[in-house]
Swiss-Prot record:
It comes from Haemophilus influenzae (strain ATCC 51907 / DSM 11121 / KW20 / Rd). This is Thiamine import ATP-binding protein ThiQ. Gene3D superfamilies: P-loop containing nucleotide triphosphate hydrolases. It catalyses: thiamine(out) + ATP + H2O = thiamine(in) + ADP + phosphate + H(+). One of its GO terms (molecular function) is ATP hydrolysis activity.
Length: 215
């Protein structure tokens, strides 16, 4: 569950105010012009920015002032932020243990998540040997390893071609079903999401100006 009550950010160029209610397990697309406040909305929910006033509730707990690591949220960006000198397995391990010293149970968990995103045979590879779509699968798997119930996606697939975007969106939908995730996805291609989301939010001039259900 995500609930924002009169959340205000006093940005110098564009003051923003957000009111939002998303039920647990819902999938929501966020659209709008560049600079309208879409990424800022996700950053406020994730804890990368803090509001001047208002409240942010996540899964029935007030997280308005919580640090990012304290929130029930994982966030995936367009930049996959993989370490080029580490294998896929090691990059995934960073999601649960920065020391990379894994227990047998943690190693098994990594292998299971890697298989769930189609990377079971790529664990020993370095990122430079992967395609763009495979790199984003690694980044997605790292998010999933954190076992957070809310998944935020900030245009993570915009650099991929249409075929790969459709494949990744289908994978996201499958994982949301399996793990009962609440999803917020910033996109410039809402037509690719038809039939797989519950709401579309339109962000305009720092506010949510429209809400469309059942897309």
């Amino acid at each position: 569950m995500i609930y924002l009550n009169n959340v205000i950010l006093n940005d110098k160029t564009l003051p923003m105010c957000f009111n939002l209610s998303v039920n647990a397990g819902e999938r929501v697309a966020i659209i709008g012009e560049s600079g309208a406040g879409k990424s800022t909305l996700l950053n406020l929910i994730a804890g990368f920015e803090f509001p001047a006033q208002g409240e942010i509730w996540l899964n029935d707990k007030n997280h308005t002032r919580s640090a990012p690591y304290e929130r029930p949220v994982s966030m995936l960006f367009q930049e996959n932020n993989l370490f080029p000198h580490l294998t896929v397995q090691q990059n995934l391990a960073l999601g649960i243990k920065p020391s990379l010293k894994l227990t047998a149970l943690e190693q098994e968990k990594i292998e299971q998540v890697a298989c769930s995103v189609g990377l079971g045979d790529y664990l020993e590879r370095l990122p430079n040997s992967l395609s763009g779509g495979q790199k984003q699968r690694v980044a997605l798997a790292r998010c999933l390893l954190r076992d957070k119930p809310i998944l935020l996606l900030d245009e993570p697939f915009s650099a991929l071609d249409q075929k790969l975007r459709v494949e990744m969106l289908a994978l996201i939908a499958k994982l949301c079903d399996e793990k009962d995730l609440t999803l917020l996805l910033v996109t410039h291609q809402p037509s690719e999401l038809i039939g797989s989301i519950d709401q579309v939010l339109v962000v305009e001039n720092g506010q949510i100006s429209q809400l469309q259900k059942g897309v």
